[in-house]
Amino acid sequence: MKLRTLCLAAAGLLLLGSCAKEEAESFDKFEDMALEAWMQQHRPELLKNYQSDGGYYVDVLDAGDMEAAPISDTVCWVSFDFSGRDLSGNIILTRRADEAHQVGSFTKYTRYVPYYRYCGERFSGSLIEGTYLAMRNTLHLDPDYVAAHPERNLPTELRLREGSQVVLYMPSRVVGSGGVSGDGGYEGQSGYTLDARRPFIVTMTICDTVKNPLEHEGREVDEFCKTHNGGLKMYD
């Protein structure tokens, strides 16, 4: 009797897990169709810039410094400017002082500087998954889209690097299960957060890549002392 009860309980858990998986897959398909319809109406030129790994669309505003090594060449820390909106255009969070002024969330005690995050070979959760995928994967661009923007000097296959600027239109499954909100002075428009299971638009600029952050910061401090002095004295 006890064994039968345990078997029934296990079967019930498997059934619940199967139902949850089917529900998630069903929602993903629905959201994909909804996001595609939104892109068709608002950004039809990006439909063929769809990235199958992650299910997002990309607009490349700047390919970046093609002499610089791509992020995906190595494991590194990435410094990147970042601003996020919902599909209605409301700013949810920003690292940019000009946008903070624009939406009335600017504070004098907030240091508006780029994010600084680790970007390894495997997704660790330190980045929004969609931004991680864009950094690590080769972006495939529609040849007609590339031809329509000769001033950007875009290749049809691009790996992000220093200077790259992109806009990502991401489904919620590569954004986060809990939605998005700004904090610590990086809030967007007052009263706006991104609810769970909602697409997210991210504008991102790659500012720098660093292999060893401590060594890099040490060099920056030394350079500041040498160049600006400011009464500072270096000690060995």
Name these PLM-found stretches.
Residues 1-19:
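Sec-dependent bacterial lipoprotein signal peptides
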Residues 19-236:
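Cross-family detector of peptidyl-prolyl cis-trans isomerase
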